[in-house]
């Protein structure tokens, strides 16, 4: 079987064994860090993350890729077809949430690697030289569960996060990113790509599970991501006074956990008030001293607000700040705003969306426009190079959980489409698209 003729000269034959080859590799990859309930545990910089990276490095090297790592731990597999030409970069991330899903991120890395390798095989057989080279990437610490913020590797790569600040970031046990990467031999000594160096980028592509239900509800195989939601993420410290849960009178308590609980309830109230255009969450609470007979003196909490409407997001932010002030009075506590990370919502380049739509139509794969409410590394990358973001369906929309699932059929269809998208990008189909948002 051969993909239909497209607007480029690069056509990637799809042989009948292509799905089996991908699925066999996928079975090896998803077994690393596997949990009894069908998920995975491989947070950034852990031994399991190191095992994933080692597996990927071996897979790439045996297929002729050169493997390099940059100073923040992003791992690249490079294929040079046209010496001196820029690269099309494709990939995602290998790290996971605690007891997370096995498809989130890792699918996109392997799919990108397979797409690049299929291109290599075609170039070797045909003698055709693409306009650009191709590289695969595993972005370090996309999830942000062990080290904050999320999308750390791509943020450093795109210049929105300082390298030293990222390397000095510590987890809850005081281990720094620098030390965690060193422990898994995952830190490089020089940049792999640079806007002024010998290696530059032409475009970026990423495929990911949807982590929602739009594709499933519409019985569609591929989501063409045209916009990312904005996100405001906050770290708060709620500070009270430690006391005895039995002896301290209720009216005398300055209960940090009560203050935090009021803020959590406020988040849900705000979501209900603003409707489906706003998502609010509190995903992590650290309670001190966390004793059953002690009124908590301090709670560290992580919150986020997300929306595709900037005005609505600003209004929700103002509402949250009012409710925080009310919680301070009600609980007799002080709330310290430690840090905030803000990601604006922007459109992906329309030329990339159309390229992917045309490729899906040519392959006979159903597609539809979708937005991403979750952050992805392409959120950062689209600001510096033309970028394409694709989704495959998530059964029941479950993600960041061990029950996360995408069918083999949808996984393989996604790899086929990504292969064709990368082929068209390698032949310059996005040359007219600029970086940033329209």
UniProtKB/Swiss-Prot annotation:
Question: Does the record bear Metal-binding in its keywords?
Answer: yes
Q: Which UniProt keywords apply?
A: Hydrolase, Isopeptide bond, Metal-binding, Ubl conjugation, Zinc
| Residues reported in the UniProt entry to bind Zn(2+) 1 | 95, 104, 208
Enzyme's top EC category: hydrolase
InterPro entries, sorted: Amidase_Cbmase, Bact_exopeptidase_dim_dom, Peptidase_M20
Q: What does the entry list as the binding residues for Zn(2+) 2?
A: 104, 143, 400
Q: GO MF terms on file?
A: hydrolase activity, acting on carbon-nitrogen (but not peptide) bonds, in linear amidines; metal ion binding
- Enumerate the Pfam families for this protein: Peptidase_M20
For the cross-link Isoglutamyl lysine isopeptide (Lys-Gln) (interchain with Q-Cter in protein Pup), list the residue numbers. 217
Swiss-Prot/TrEMBL cofactor(s): Zn(2+)
Answer whether the UniProt record assigns the keyword Ubl conjugation to this protein.
yes
How is the co-factor bound, per the entry?
A: Binds 2 Zn(2+) ions per subunit.
| Documented EC number(s) | 3.5.-.-
- Record-linked SUPFAM superfamilies: Bacterial exopeptidase dimerisation domain, Zn-dependent exopeptidases
**Into which family does the record put it?**
Belongs to the peptidase M20 family.
Q: Quote the NCBIfam families the UniProt record gives.
A: hydantase, PRK09290.2-1
Q: By what name is this protein known? A: Putative hydrolase MSMEG_3995/MSMEI_3903
């Amino acid at each position: 079987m051969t993909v239909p003729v497209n607007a480029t000269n690069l056509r990637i034959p799809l042989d009948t064994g292509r799905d089996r080859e991908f699925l066999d590799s996928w079975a090896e990859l998803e077994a690393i860090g596997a949990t009894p309930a069908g998920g995975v545990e491989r947070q950034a910089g852990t031994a399991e993350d190191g095992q994933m990276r080692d597996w990927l490095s071996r897979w790439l090297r045996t297929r002729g890729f050169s493997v390099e790592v940059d100073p923040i731990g992003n791992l690249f597999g490079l294929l040079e077809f046209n010496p001196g030409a820029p690269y099309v970069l494709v990939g995602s991330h290998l790290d996971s949430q605690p007891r997370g899903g096995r498809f989130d991120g890792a699918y996109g890395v392997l799919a990108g690697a397979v797409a690049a390798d299929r291109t290599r095989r075609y170039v070797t057989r045909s003698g055709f030289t693409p306009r650009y080279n191709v590289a695969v990437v595993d972005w370090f610490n996309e999830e942000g569960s062990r080290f904050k913020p999320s999308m750390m590797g791509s943020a450093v790569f795109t210049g929105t996060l300082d390298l030293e600040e990222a390397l000095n970031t510590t987890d809850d046990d005081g281990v720094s990113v620098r030390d965690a990467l060193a422990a898994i031999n995952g830190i490089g000594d020089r940049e792999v790509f640079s806007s002024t160096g010998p290696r530059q980028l032409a475009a970026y592509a990423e495929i990911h599970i949807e982590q929602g239900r739009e594709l499933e509800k519409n019985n569609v195989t591929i989501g063409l991501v045209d916009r990312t939601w904005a996100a405001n993420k906050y770290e708060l410290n709620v500070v009270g006074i430690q006391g005895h849960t039995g002896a301290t009178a209720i009216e005398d308590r300055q209960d940090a956990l009560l203050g935090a609980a009021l803020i959590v309830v406020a988040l849900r109230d705000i979501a209900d008030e603003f409707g489906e255009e706003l998502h609010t969450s509190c995903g992590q609470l650290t309670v001190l001293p966390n004793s059953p007979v002690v009124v908590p003196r301090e709670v560290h909490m992580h919150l986020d607000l997300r929306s595709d409407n900037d005005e609505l997001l600003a209004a929700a932010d103002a509402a949250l700040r009012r409710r925080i002030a009310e919680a301070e009075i009600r609980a007799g506590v002080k709330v310290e705003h430690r840090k905030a990370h803000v990601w604006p919502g922007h459109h992906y380049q329309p030329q990339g969306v159309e390229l992917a739509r045309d490729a899906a139509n040519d392959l006979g794969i159903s597609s539809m426009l979708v937005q991403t409410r979750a952050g992805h590394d392409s959120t950062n990358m689209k600001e510096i190079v033309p970028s394409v973001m694709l989704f495959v369906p998530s059964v029941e929309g479950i993600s960041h959980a061990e029950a996360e699932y995408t069918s083999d059929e949808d996984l393989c269809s996604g790899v086929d489409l990504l292969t064709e998208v990368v082929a068209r990008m390698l032949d310059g189909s996005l040359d007219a698209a600029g970086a940033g948002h329209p």
